[in-house]
Amino acid sequence: MKVWMAILISILCWQSSVWAVCPAWSPARAQEEISRLQQQIKQWDDDYWKEGKSEVEDGVYDQLSARLTQWQRCFGSEPRDVMMPPLNGAVMHPVAHTGVRKMVDKNALSLWMRERSDLWVQPKVDGVAVTLVYRDGKLNKAISRGNGLKGEDWTQKVSLISAVPQTVSGPLANSTLQGEIFLQREGHIQQQMGGINARAKVAGLMMRQDDSDTLNSLGVFVWAWPDGPQLMTDRLKELATAGFTLTQRYTRAVKNADEVARVRNEWWKAKLPFVTDGVVVRGAKEPESRHWLPGQAEWLVAWKYQPVAQVAEVKAIQFAVGKSGKISVVASLAPVMLDDKKVQRVNIGSVRRWQEWDIAPGDQILVSLAGQGIPRIDDVVWRGAERTKPTPPENRFNSLTCYFASDVCQEQFISRLVWLGSKQVLGLDGIGEAGWRALHQTHRFEHIFSWLLLTPEQLQNTPGIAKSKSAQLWHQFNLARKQPFTRWVMAMGIPLTRAALNASDERSWSQLLFSTEQFWQQLPGTGSGRARQVIEWKENAQIKKLGSWLAAQQITGFEP
């Protein structure tokens, strides 16, 4: 009893953290938003169950269904029944499908496993559930899961699936099996390939009116043999002998949550013959089948994988000005987890790209991780009923603006500071965007090199800069004075690559100022257009003023 209370508390704590984030909507707005999403999900359900097609990815459907339930709980509506199929022409299951309760995390699974023994882990194969009924050694009936008590008669369809044994013998001759009809895959790696909408594809094949040869692309994974042999090893052996070989191959004994986690991670990265969305842990000891009821299984639980892509709510649209003056758009998100990374922001790109995406606060977007773990937008999966998009700033900035601070230059000025402090430029360790903002807000820099004048006392008394860090920062600023001339020129934003700048052999400011367009044009990777940009840059009044200031500070290469 204590274990169940602990699991319940764990689940409630997790749920409360999700449900607590309720939209700040009026009752009328809430009713409209809930009604619109409810109608859309109902349409998807009708397409799925009546026509066997899906206009939405399985993962997106699941997450938007969960979002709808969250909204309904937030505003006191009755949560919808999830994915309840129509019961036209339904057939009673000899043994009810119980479904499986989902564990929130490894800790919840560990609590569930603590007082249980003889436990086994299987992949949670992603397809559609089915009952197989054998009588006198022959396949007598195949029934879709339906609502767990009744389902559709799939006997004709299943009889055409070559992977399903049509005859069996021994203990299986008069048996009822439960399993998953799945899309057969060759070397499917879940981590890399995701769900590929497998559930909807299988449903589509099973719903088609024609008995297509494509049914042979389906397989079956038996995960339950109600009233079968008591020992799991005996069950697996008999199933394998009958032709259900995958069950024995992918069922492993486990003693604790750590072992489950290892197997789960292994299958997440391994080449498998089917799509999966997690693992199921089940006890070998099961009640008699007459006691099985939908939603009442206490002997098995699931631990699903985190989706490769997550549906996230857009909380705000923000505009950033980079060091070159380009305006980029960033979406601020309600936090989601991707792998082990908490994602709260995603870069949309240019203003034009944002307008093409048509993203507004309140929309639901699908986010995944691209190379090097960078969040990206895959799709806009739901747009809110009321959409207000902010106005982007005027495009008044360019590569030669905001070397000196002003109110309108705030964002580009900070971007320039972040750039010059980066490893590839002046290498100022220990300070990023937040640190630069704190310094500028307190000391009101005149230009991008004003930080060279800060004293240890000023750094120590800067809000947002830890006193223990201020001495290290002052040391970094002093070390920067000894950086090579080319590094300082890069910090000033010269429109050249480092390779081209090094090849120029320019080692002083005066020498650089007298270099001609023809000189720059002969450098590697520098054409006529780039050479003209360099000339425009070095003749800019702000650049000349910065060069004179650095000379007064006796920075290497700038001295008269």
From Swiss-Prot:
Catalytic residues (positions): K124
Record's keyword terms, sorted: DNA damage, DNA repair, DNA replication, Ligase, NAD
A Pfam family of this chain: DNA_ligase_aden
Any one GO molecular function term: DNA ligase (NAD+) activity
Reactions this protein catalyses: NAD(+) + (deoxyribonucleotide)n-3'-hydroxyl + 5'-phospho-(deoxyribonucleotide)m = (deoxyribonucleotide)n+m + AMP + beta-nicotinamide D-nucleotide
GO biological process: DNA repair; DNA replication
Enzyme Commission (EC) number: 6.5.1.2
Family: Belongs to the NAD-dependent DNA ligase family. LigB subfamily.
Protein task: Catalyzes the formation of phosphodiester linkages between 5'-phosphoryl and 3'-hydroxyl groups in double-stranded DNA using NAD as a coenzyme and as the energy source for the reaction.
The name this protein goes by in its record: DNA ligase B
Organism: Escherichia coli (strain 55989 / EAEC)
